[in-house]
Amino acid sequence: MKTKTQVVVIGGGLIGCSILYHLTKLGWSNVVLLERDELTSGSTWHAAAGIHGLHDSTNISRIQHYTMNLYKQLEEETGQGCGIFQPGSLYLAQTEEREHQLKIQAAKAKLYGMNFHEVSITEAENLHPFVNFEGVRCIMWEPDGGNVDPSGVTNAYAAGARQNGAEIYRFTPVIGTKQNRDGTWIVETEKGNIHTNWIVNAAGPLGQGSG
């Protein structure tokens, strides 16, 4: 196990592996990830993993749009399947407030070059004949909506990060962290300590126990 790195990422779920992957894409090759158990063994394995490109937050919309386009690239880069399934998504509004919200999102979609547009009830019934559209006043259709396999995506990020020089240590719990006077850190594990410039705590609910 390495004893000195630029960055230590704590947590081997989808977020941690994504951070590790993107650090390597930015040229940070001397980076490691520590996972207390197996990759995806925390919250990731049972995530719904729905994918859609729009959110009320503009910044989150940009991230979601970027990520949706990244999955196929990840598969090509790593050979690891992401379980991409995109049958399309319908968004229904039964209130004036929700209709207004959806129309704002449709305007954002045009700005980002995304396919998200209003359809009639007849069109929606053809797309999803088992949905009850009674009382619905506005319907938006996102052809690229769907879901992915969260474990597959996580392992694709991990594979891509490894290809770019990162190292991943499974079954390596973090038992403590200490900051040095110069601002660097010591990450303590059961297998030894790592001296690092930066720590990214991506351990989710278990993060408080990482020091």
Regions from the PLM with identified roles:
Residues 1-15, 32:
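Beta1/beta-strand and adjacent pyrophosphate-binding region of the FAD-binding site
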Residues 35, 120-121, 170-172:
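Short loop/edge segments at beta-strand edges and connector loops
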Residues 140-198, 202-209:
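Helical element adjacent to the flavin cofactor pocket in flavoenzyme catalytic cores
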Residues 15, 39, 206:
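Conserved Rossmann-like nucleotide-cofactor binding loop
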Residues 80-91, 105, 118, 125-164, ...:
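Helix-loop-beta segment of a Rossmann-like dinucleotide-binding subdomain
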Residues 24-45:
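Glycine-rich FAD pyrophosphate-binding loop
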Residues 20, 24, 160:
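Gly/Ala-rich phosphate-binding loop of Rossmann-like dinucleotide-binding domains
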